């Protein structure tokens, strides 16, 4: 089994585990749904009644003591996952019915209670811990209690339970604190059960804070991480910032660097064309060494938006490769360069069967795509 296959299967396993979490969670919800829904509706009505009375007096903010009194009146203990779920649904119902102000008043009054609850849920069954991380992501608001909650989430993020880890990381991304996200990445990097890099990349992309600050801090700590974490970071940077060219160029041209990291850097320059990177990409794409086919394939794709001396020549050279992926990427990039059938006649009429067949394949593929688009347009009329 190749390394790429292992990565695909590992990523699939992580995705499957999260699907299983959602399925189990939904099954539990269905079993308790009638009772929970009825109770949530009752809590919502009680909240609305309080809000209406407060509106008459001009006071819509809930102090913590009032929140605690309300919870006691309604026999809700947020330390119990069933009651936490009921409360969550009740507040969500308010917001869904256009009563966001009423919901927000309660949520803000709840903030001082969250640190103690977060520590309490850490001691519970990890599925409950995982759910509380979701609760925090949804109901935490920026306050003086953030530092305590961030520390709790770091503890959640190092649990062996995968659901707990991923939910905790999602909450940390939602908090938008770059310092703590980097701390969480560092902890994931050191764990035996590593979080798949695609999951980590997608999480970083969802970060709600300043991406420039997060990227700066990740680059500063870059050499401290293992290769898999580095790869996740590079892919994140590729999607979020065009201001890291010098950093990426150094990785791309470092022959001692891990090849997967170099590939990531090459892809970066495919997304953000840079004149200084052009000659290196041309060199990679023109490399006829069979063992270097991956460099040639990635570089051929990256040259799609480059023009100037050497680019077309390198792509035509890549089109003669014995490797299908190199040929395909070269053909796509030649098309992107705007080369028509007539301009590619030297390739089509040449003696190299691989190159000729690939261009024929791409031209036929493009024709089929256009036909499908025309069919869709015809159906929509």
How would you describe each model-predicted region?
Residues 1-41:
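N-terminal signal-anchor transmembrane alpha helix of single-pass membrane proteins
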